[in-house]
UniProtKB/Swiss-Prot annotation:
Source organism of this protein record: Leishmania braziliensis
GO BP terms, alphabetized: ubiquinone biosynthetic process
Signal peptide: none
Residues that coordinate or bind Zn(2+): 77-78, 81, 93
CC cofactor: Zn(2+)
EC number of the protein: 4.1.1.130
Subunit structure: Component of a multi-subunit COQ enzyme complex.
Compartments where located: Mitochondrion inner membrane
Protein name: Ubiquinone biosynthesis protein COQ4 homolog, mitochondrial
C-alpha cells in the first residue's frame, strides 16, 4: 500500500503531510451544507454512533510510515461507506471489504468475506457476485466512463469535505453501489 501511495503524486503528498481524521473533522463536517460530501460523512457517522477517535490504534508496526498507512486505511473506511453509498448491513460491509481488497490487496477483505458469508442468506450470497463485479469495476486504474479510479488511500478526503458530493464522486470515479445495481437491473 505504501508503494501505491509513493507511486502517486497525491499519495506522496499525503504521506509527507500525514493528515489525521480526528473528531474535529467530524465536528467541522456537521456544519456543512447537506449537499456536501462532509455533511454526508457526518450523517453516516452520527447515524451509526461512530467517532473517528473510536478506531483502535495501529499496533505492532515499527516503521512509522507503514503505521501511518495502516492508520489511513482504517480512517478512510468510513469515507468509503459514504462515497460508495454503502450502509452498515452485513452485505454492504462485505461489499466495502471487497472494494478495499481490490484497492489494497490486504487479505482482511477476503477473510471478512469468508467469515461473513456464513451469515448471509442464499439471496444475499447471490448478491455478493454482483458486489464482487462492482468492486472490480471500481478497482484502481480500472477505466469506466473515462476517469481512472485512484487508489482510495491517495484521495485527499480531508480536503474534500466542503465539496459537493457529486463533485467528489466525479473526482474519484467511483460508481456508488446503488447506482451500479440500478444499472445492472436495467440490463
Amino acid at each position: 500500500m505504501k508503494n501505491c501511495m509513493m507511486a502517486d503524486q497525491r499519495g506522496r503528498s499525503i504521506l509527507k503531510h500525514q493528515p489525521v481524521v480526528g473528531d474535529e473533522v467530524l465536528e467541522f463536517s456537521r456544519g456543512l451544507a447537506p449537499s456536501t460530501f462532509g455533511f454526508r460523512y457526518a450523517a453516516y457517522m452520527d447515524r451509526n454512533h461512530f467517532l473517528p477517535s473510536g478506531r483502535a490504534a495501529v499496533k505492532h508496526i515499527a516503521d512509522p510510515t507503514l503505521a501511518y498507512v495502516m492508520m489511513r486505511h482504517r480512517q478512510c473506511h468510513d469515507f468509503l461507506h459514504v462515497i460508495t453509498g454503502c450502509g452498515r448491513s452485513v452485505e454492504e460491509e462485505l461489499a466495502v471489504k471487497v472494494f478495499e481488497w481490490k484497492h489494497t490487496g490486504l487479505p482482511l477483505g477476503l477473510l471478512s468475506l469468508l467469515g461473513g458469508a456464513s451469515r448471509l442468506s442464499a439471496t444475499q450470497l447471490a448478491h455478493m457476485r454482483l458486489f464482487w463485479e462492482w468492486a472490480s469495476h471500481n478497482a484502481p486504474c480500472s477505466r469506466h466512463d473515462k476517469p481512472a479510479v485512484p487508489m482510495y488511500l491517495n484521495v485527499p478526503w480531508e480536503d474534500m469535505l466542503a465539496k459537493e458530493y457529486d463533485e467528489v464522486a466525479a473526482y474519484t470515479g467511483i460508481t456508488p453501489l446503488p447506482v451500479f445495481l440500478k444499472k445492472h437491473q436495467k440490463q
